[in-house]
């Protein structure tokens, strides 16, 4: 399929997509919010009063959902290389979290307190070549895992988008090394042909606490 045909198919699907329509009606910035909502409803992993870090937050729909879930007593810190239009109640930090200065700034926003949830919906710029895209994605997942290990409370949750392919099984095993519970989810809002799945990890193992 040519890039032109692929773009046309994407546009047709986008226009007719119920999640796109629902997101617009509900005021969310992206259909991706329904991937998060489905797993939150199932696993109850964001609660009132929680502190949440949202990595790769643009355009902001996950942060919108997270701030609703944590309420005024909680905190949501969003980070992305891209700018995000302001969202009420969200602390936004623009920059590359793989850089030490940005990572330290993230921790400063938490007032150096441990957080309850780390979200990551990060994806690299897609080239269309799985042999290039998947390793880039796995690298970002590993960096997000590192932040989760260093910033989560012992009972905290790490929720991350992962693409199935080379390195997937190894990443899952890495998460199982650090967390007591790891589950894989394929939300209904995730397109069937997409290789993306979402991993939810919970409860850092005592020996792995930073």
Swiss-Prot record:
Binding residues for S-adenosyl-L-methionine:
60, 62, 80, 96, 121
Q: Where is the active site?
A: 161
Q: Which SUPFAM superfamilies match?
A: S-adenosyl-L-methionine-dependent methyltransferases
What are the annotated disulfide bridges? none
Swiss-Prot/TrEMBL keywords: Cytoplasm, Methyltransferase, rRNA processing, S-adenosyl-L-methionine, Transferase
Enzyme Commission designation: 2.1.1.166
Q: Which GO terms describe its molecular function?
A: rRNA (uridine-2'-O-)-methyltransferase activity
Say which enzyme class the record assigns.
Answer: transferase
Where is this protein found?
Cytoplasm
Reaction catalysed by this enzyme: uridine(2552) in 23S rRNA + S-adenosyl-L-methionine = 2'-O-methyluridine(2552) in 23S rRNA + S-adenosyl-L-homocysteine + H(+)
Asked if the Swiss-Prot or TrEMBL record annotates the protein with the keyword Protein biosynthesis, the reply is no
Task: Pull one GO CC term from this UniProt entry.
Answer: cytoplasm
Carries keyword Methyltransferase? yes
What family does the entry list? Belongs to the class I-like SAM-binding methyltransferase superfamily. RNA methyltransferase RlmE family.
General function of this protein: Specifically methylates the uridine in position 2552 of 23S rRNA at the 2'-O position of the ribose in the fully assembled 50S ribosomal subunit.
Q: What is this protein called?
A: Ribosomal RNA large subunit methyltransferase E
Gene that this polypeptide is encoded by: rlmE
């Amino acid at each position: 399929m040519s890039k032109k045909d692929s773009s046309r198919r994407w546009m047709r699907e986008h226009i007719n997509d119920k999640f796109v329509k629902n997101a617009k009606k509900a005021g969310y910035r992206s259909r991706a919010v329904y991937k998060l909502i489905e797993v939150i409803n199932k696993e109850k992993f964001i609660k009132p009063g929680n502190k949440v870090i949202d990595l790769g937050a643009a355009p902001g729909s996950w942060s919108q959902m997270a701030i609703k879930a944590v309420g005024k007593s909680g905190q949501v810190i969003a980070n992305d290389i891209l700018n995000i239009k302001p969202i009420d109640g969200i602390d936004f930090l623009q920059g590359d979290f793989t850089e030490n200065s940005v990572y330290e700034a993230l921790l400063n926003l938490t007032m150096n307190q441990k957080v309850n949830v780390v979200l990551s919906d990060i994806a690299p710029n897609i080239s269309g070549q799985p042999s290039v895209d998947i390793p880039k994605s796995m690298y970002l997942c590993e960096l997000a895992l590192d932040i989760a290990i260093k910033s989560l409370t012992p009972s905290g949750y790490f929720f991350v988008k992962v693409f199935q392919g080379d390195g997937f099984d190894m990443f899952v095993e890495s998460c199982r090394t650090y967390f007591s519970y790891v589950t894989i989810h394929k939300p209904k809002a995730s397109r069937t042909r997409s290789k993306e799945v979402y991993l939810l990890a919970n409860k850092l193992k005592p020996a792995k606490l930073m």
